[in-house]
């Protein structure tokens, strides 16, 4: 057995001695880095994280690391582009309920700011299917790989002051994957080009 396996077995023995039921799961390595990491999670009805595993028990990971296949999207009835009126509809579910759509038929776009060492700030447009959720740990790791700088923080941009200070000429009620770079031209400390990430 490798040293890594021996350490894992030692942890398992300690937990058993303490009377704890644990599951060893794949986990994000975080700031420590490394190709792989194992985390021991105590099984309980309540806690700060979830364990995702296959029915066979051959794979287990925490939410930050888990890999899965998305559910099948519901196809649109036709491929004809059309404008939708969406007054007072601020969420994916509200748009779907009022327009006879399924969340898998909509693209969700979220703005983030990647803050790197040396006050280098990159605006991010993260695009994902409307029935999915953005895993911010995975997004952080992906952005860190895309740039040659050390990523310090990834912040979702939601507050009105930050939006008004850094974004101009936003299309009313629409932030899409094709949002023009001119919308960030007025920002004093953001890069002037969107990094677009589509899943």
PLM ranges: what are they?
Residues 1-199:
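Extended, low-hydrophobicity, polar/charged segments
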